[in-house]
Amino acid sequence: MRPLAGGLLKVVFVVFASLCAWYSGYLLAELIPDAPLSSAAYSIRSIGERPVLKAPVPKRQKCDHWTPCPSDTYAYRLLSGGGRSKYAKICFEDNLLMGEQLGNVARGINIAIVNYVTGNVTATRCFDMYEGDNSGPMTKFIQSAAPKSLLFMVTYDDGSTRLNNDAKNAIEALGSKEIRNMKFRSSWVFIAAKGLELPSEIQREKINHSDAKNNRYSGWPAEIQIEGCIPKERS
């Protein structure tokens, strides 16, 4: 009787195990929607994975500022030249006023004049300060700026060798504190206003002198820049 009872117990166990396996398969088929097996397996694996949060791509600001200027201001950025291959740039309200791409920058002092009321550029000129007598024409150009004008000045290569006293006086009259400190191949940027006052917190000028020990480029100092936001005229 014992062998018979043992065999019967094995049969019952096999049948029970088969029923459990069939029922488990049935439940799995009902729970997983009709989809490729690979997709189902991926879904199961993904249950334990943490969601990956992607940081949004930073929005580009006017003149490549890190933070946006208020809507009631003008954005500007002035960049001096650096070495032979780094040309000076003047950007205003995300418009390149002077730069290598436009072909309107050259050795010396580069100047852009902007109408403060409209925000439109009125004139751009470059003046070679290494060769030729260009201090006189530059002085007249600066003095020709109409009232309520913004003047942006940047150097590329040398801006001091042929810079005479009259030109220095004209730039000094606009508020420059560094024009008389200019040396051979000094990097210099300056923002001025004619017929209006700029806010005191705005950085208006920056200079970097050539130094054989510290020059970034052979014979030239590193380029320098200033940027900021100028309040628009209130209507």
Curated annotation (Swiss-Prot):
Q: Where is the signal peptide?
A: 1-29
Swiss-Prot/TrEMBL GO biological process terms: apoptotic process; insulin secretion
Q: Carries keyword Signal?
A: yes
Q: Which residues are glycosylated?
A: N120, N208
Q: How is it modified after translation?
A: 2 N-termini have been observed in the mature protein: the first at Glu-30, resulting from signal peptide cleavage, the second at Ser-46.
GO cellular component annotations of the record: extracellular exosome; extracellular region; extracellular space
Compartment annotation: Secreted
The cysteines joined by S-S bonds are C63-C91, C69-C229
Pfam families attached here? ILEI
GO MF, one annotated term: carbohydrate binding
Domain named GG-type lectin is located at 72-233
* Matches recorded under PROSITE patterns: GG_LECTIN
Task: List the expressing tissues.
Answer: Highly expressed in the pancreas. Also found in the colon, kidney, prostate, small intestine and testis.
Q: Which UniProt keywords apply?
A: Apoptosis, Cytokine, Disulfide bond, Glycoprotein, Lectin, Secreted, Signal
What is the similarity comment for this entry?
A: Belongs to the FAM3 family.
What role does this protein play? Induces apoptosis of alpha and beta cells in a dose- and time-dependent manner.
Name this polypeptide is given: Protein FAM3B
What is the organism of origin for this protein?
Answer: Homo sapiens
Gene symbol of the encoding locus? FAM3B
